[in-house]
Amino acid sequence: VAGMTKPTVPLVLGLWFVLQALPGLTEQADDNSTPSLLAAFYGNTLAEAIVLKNPRFVAAIQAQRQKNDTLPSPLTQNETLKMLLLEETPWVLSARNENERITQLAELLDRAKCVKMQYRALTKLLALQNDDGGFPWKKGMGSNIEQTLSVLECYAQLYTQNLLGDNESLVRLRSEAINFLNKKIAGDTARIAQTEKLSNSQLRYLVLQTILATPLSETEGAGRTMLCEKAEKGWKSFDLEGKALTAQLLYRTGNQEAARRIVNSLLGYATITDEEIWWQNIRSNRNTLGDIRLHTLLMNTVALVTPHNAQLAGMA
């Protein structure tokens, strides 16, 4: 297309993988499950954004659906890439053939359907939120800090990309959920005082607080200050996830020099070749995220703290 830069092969591959993974995210296997509904809300919100921002691409997918021939897929042509992706996204090859995948994508990139499914997932998700503001694993269970963190992290990611409108229900969800975390994490000053090494959940909360910037009570404010001090002093003992979260926290709170030191430390653990950069010890790290999500966290941290880092291209 005139005036457009020719996309690179990694970009095309990445876009193809993301698009083929979205149908798996938008499926709602369990309306009583926070993770399932959260994935459906997130996936349909992203799909709607793709429809709005890439009308020509959507038109091309719809046109391809009308044809009998198949669209060559980099996924099926590269065994190494296929195996890496399928370890955590097995639904990508669940379709019997490429034509079926194109059909799935065409159905996914239907804005009316996206909006309908997005609304349905949000309505069900709001119904799962407990009176204390937290989210359970399943309907009827008590509020869980990890699940509540996941919901707010999803919200924050969509919010910072301007993909969420002025929805009163979402504002209420955010307010009640962050208040739950404020009380459970920052408000527990006695536990914080006795804690030598912060958990990744505490660090995830601190990063969320810098993004959402919600009011804290006097006790919660004191607890947050204690947590931040412990994070800055103890980051060297954290795992990769903890180091990345601490770097984001320090960067967002104005301590950019310390954040850069942590990023340099993270890069010291990486395997660097002429073309690629990755962390081989992710699997042995016993991270609370999946391997792909942890790599993404590390990559995003490097991009946030050192946006002009020449090594970023090798991480994608």
Predicted regions and their residues:
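Large, well-folded core regions of big proteins
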Residues: V1-A316
